[in-house]
A protein has these predicted regions:
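Solvent-exposed, non-transmembrane regions of membrane-associated and secreted proteins
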Residues: 1-169
Length: 169
């Protein structure tokens, strides 16, 4: 199958600096896939970018053994997330965050001329009646964007900075 370069089903990796996520992306969204990482929604563009593409990546919330997309609700508009694929890093800047019914798929469609990636998880936590959609628009991956993503990682999910865990000398 396409993009199965590592022969283990991994087609890419998704990185979300704000919430300290770095997860493998697998083909499909079966329970088996979602138990171990992020799934690429069949029928959407492969996560390789390009004009008039829209890849959709889905991950679980609240798994006891893995956080995956548990903290996705902490991502903010303007945040950067990255897709690492084929020795390339694709950067996306979050431009839309919304909660929809599971049957509402209009926001996952290709928009001619645009390169979008949407991260999807169930919400609210423990009820899972709706879907949280975090969409990013492709932006050039420059040193500035890399620095911006690193800054978001430092701020952490609540924007207050990561707690210092070093013990005093």
């Amino acid at each position: 199958s396409a993009l199965n370069l590592e022969k283990n089903g991994i087609m890419a990796y998704v990185e979300i600096p704000r919430i300290d996520v770095y997860e493998p992306v697998y083909h499909g969204t079966s329970e088996e896939v979602l138990a171990k990482g992020v799934g690429h929604l069949e029928g959407t563009s492969l996560p390789i970018g390009g004009e008039s593409t829209h890849t959709v990546l889905s991950g679980h919330t609240g798994l006891p053994e893995a956080e995956i997309f548990t903290k996705l609700e902490s991502v903010k508009e303007g945040d950067i997330f990255l897709i690492h694929v084929l020795n390339e890093t694709l950067a996306y800047k979050v431009d839309q965050i919304k909660v929809v019914e599971p049957s509402e798929t209009d926001d996952l469609k290709i928009v001619p001329g645009y390169d979008y990636a949407t991260l999807v998880t169930c919400t609210p936590y423990g009820i899972n009646s709706h879907r949280l959609l975090v969409r990013g628009i492709r932006t050039e991956y420059t040193q500035d964007v890399s620095d911006e993503a690193a800054g978001q990682a430092e701020e952490g999910p609540d924007g207050a900075g990561k707690q210092c865990t070093k013990k005093p000398l």
